[in-house]
A protein has these predicted regions:
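Carboxylate/His-rich catalytic cores and anion/metal-binding grooves
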Residues: 111-131, 177-202
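Beta-lactam-recognizing serine transpeptidase/beta-lactamase-like catalytic domain environment
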Residues: 133-138, 142-148, 186-239, 243-493, ...
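Envelope-exposed proteins and targeting segments
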Residues: 40, 64, 80-83, 153-157, ...
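Conserved small/polar residues in nucleotide/adenosyl-binding loops
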Residues: 552-557
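Juxtamembrane extramembrane loops of integral membrane proteins
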Residues: 1-20
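Conserved, well-ordered alpha-helix/loop/beta-strand core segments that scaffold catalytic motifs
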Residues: 140-179
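Short, gly/Ser/Thr-rich active-site loops of penicillin-recognizing serine hydrolases
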Residues: 407-415, 506-548
Length: 557
């Protein structure tokens, strides 16, 4: 620490040498400290190690205006949840100018829960007043300490995260990119938020934190600082068919027994064909359409929803209202500063795009979760929790308790969707069959009934201005036990082929680990642990042409 008024500037070269700091750096930091306050102490050197402390302490007596002050330092007991917890760093000049609480060199929550709960985690500084003589020497306390205040310790936060589940999820996501979000449906407690790839938080608390941060920031391939579970905006694919089924039931354009004919796909206009999972002619009711993921069924249902109103604009806006009531298209309001709202198109969007000339079939990709629709993994996990609750959700949150304080009332209040509760049971029955006889039979768990839905999202990049297809993303949403849900999950694996290949098995392992505390299906666990998708992630950066996985599966996009 340095008090600028007490420093002999003629000794700056010797001071720099004794404290092992570059003279120009010393002069710059001393000027910053002086600009902040000439008589108040500011930090000169931060994060002094034990090895550095001894030689500095030995030389302090030679230089007035300097002293060593101990301070708390973050330690991390587990190598997990880096983006969730966030990191701290020194306040900048602008922050000091805006908030008189902070002084140059002090730390502030920069990201994650560290930022959201900064005022709880920092505590309150104490103040002690001293009297000085004309030689600027301390001669005692001021007014016998009547104006002194004691520091108030920071408050402990109890997180909703299940550490065992979080770390298990980390292991499953090795050599894969994407996220896992797990929520307790009845409470909105977020049980796990896994981001892959991630990083070691301890690398951002030592002297090299600036260098280490730059390395993370410059990793344009892995993007470890990008919190995919909260920031990743993706097409939800076939998982979105569930919401269109619910809206169809609510709007009375379908019921459980409504049959639709599928001839390997659907001609939604004269020359426009939406392919389905089979080339054979089939007839599906609602249950069958869910567990086989029939594109035709949901395309026809969506078209009838929009055309159930006097105009396409009115129908689309009503559809938009239904979708948003599940938390899509907004930030959800969780207690983390990072996030994206996703995107749910409105009639105004299409009016602007198509100059007021469009119909239901123009927007038919909405029926299968493609096109303009974007959702984040936490929104999809919250959607699964809402289905599990038969139509309502508690705003997801990461903090369960605050020491001697209360959490926000928003994390206790029910948010009710616009779908009547009676419509959820047939949907859930179809989602159970997804696991039992449908697109995710490889993810069954003995003695645990899972309700879920696989999804495959199209994946493209721009190469020299041209759109080039990459291997599709793998998605799964679900909850268990189906009759009394304790956990709702969304797993999103970038470039993971189809939903049943990676996302569904990982989800089932997460569910098994949480409900049974151990995993018995070692064959499946080993398959996931050994799975490596790094070759897929390198393809866009190859100078040669590359191929993608286009295997035709029962899981339609």
């Amino acid at each position: 620490m340095v008090v600028p008024a007490d420093v002999n500037l003629e000794d700056s070269i010797l001071i720099s040498k004794d404290f092992n700091i570059d003279t120009s750096v010393f002069n710059e930091k001393l000027l910053d400290a002086k600009n902040f306050s000439n008589v108040k102490a500011s930090i000169l050197i931060n994060n002094i190690s034990k090895d550095e402390y001894a030689p500095i302490q030995e030389k302090l007596w030679k230089h007035s205006g300097f002293f060593v002050q101990k301070k708390s330092k973050r330690t991390y007991n587990a190598l997990t949840a880096a983006n969730l917890l966030g990191y701290i760093s020194e306040v900048n000049k602008s922050e000091v100018e805006k908030n008189s609480y902070y002084e140059i060199g002090e730390m502030i929550g920069r990201q994650g829960l560290e930022k959201t709960y900064e005022d709880k985690l920092r505590g309150v500084k104490g103040v002690k007043f001293f009297q000085k003589d004309k030689f600027n020497r301390i001669i005692g306390s001021y007014k016998n300490g009547d104006y002194d205040t004691l520091p108030i310790p920071s408050k402990d936060l109890t997180l909703t995260i299940d550490l065992d589940l979080q770390q298990y999820g980390d292991s499953l996501m090795q050599n894969k990119r994407g996220s896992i979000v797990a929520i307790e449906p009845k409470t909105g407690d977020i049980l796990a938020l896994i981001n892959s790839p991630s990083y070691d938080l301890s690398s951002l608390i030592d002297k090299n934190r600036s260098i280490n941060y730059k390395k993370l920031e410059n990793d344009s391939i892995g993007k470890p600082l990008f919190e995919r579970g909260l920031q990743g905006q993706y097409a939800p694919g076939s998982t979105f068919k569930i919401i269109n089924a619910l809206i169809g039931l609510q709007e009375n354009v379908i019921n459980e027994e409504t049959m639709h004919r599928c001839e390997g796909g659907h001609f939604y206009s004269k020359n426009a064909f939406m392919r389905c999972h089979t080339k054979e002619t089939t007839f599906s009711n609602l249950n069958n359409a869910i567990y086989t993921s029939c594109n035709t069924y949901f395309a026809k249902t969506y078209k009838e929803i929009i055309e159930n109103y006097e105009s396409s604009s009115a129908g689309l806006d009503k559809w938009n209202d239904y979708v948003r009531s599940f938390g899509f298209g907004n930030y959800l309001g969780y207690d983390h500063p990072t996030g994206q709202p996703g995107f749910i198109p409105s009639s105004q969007y299409y009016n602007n795009w198509y100059n007021n000339s469009w119909r239901a079939v123009t927007t038919i990709s909405n029926s299968i979760g493609q096109g303009e629709i974007l959702a984040t993994p936490i929104q999809l996990a919250n959607f699964a929790a809402t289905i599990a609750n038969r139509g309502w959700y508690i705003t997801p949150h990461f903090v369960k308790e605050i020491e001697n304080d209360s959490i926000n009332d928003n994390y206790k209040r029910k948010n009710v969707s616009l779908i009547d509760s009676k419509h959820f049971e047939p949907i859930i029955n179809g989602m159970i069959d997804v696991i039992d006889i449908g697109t995710a039979t490889n993810s069954k768990i003995r003695d645990i009934k899972i309700a879920g839905k696989t999804g495959t999202a199209e994946n493209f990049i721009r190469v020299n201005g041209k759109r080039k297809q990459l291997t599709d993303h793998s998605i799964f949403i679900g909850f268990a036990p189906a009759d009394d849900p304790k956990i709702a999950v969304c797993v999103f694996i970038e470039n993971g082929y189809w939903g049943s290949r990676w996302a569904a098995p990982i989800s089932s392992l997460i569910i098994e680990k949480y409900l049974k505390k151990e995993v018995n299906r070692k064959w499946l666990e080993n398959y996931i642990l050994e799975g490596n998708l790094n070759k897929e992630y390198l393809k866009p950066y190859l100078t040669c042409n590359f191929s993608i996985c286009l295997l035709y599966t029962s899981d339609a996009a």
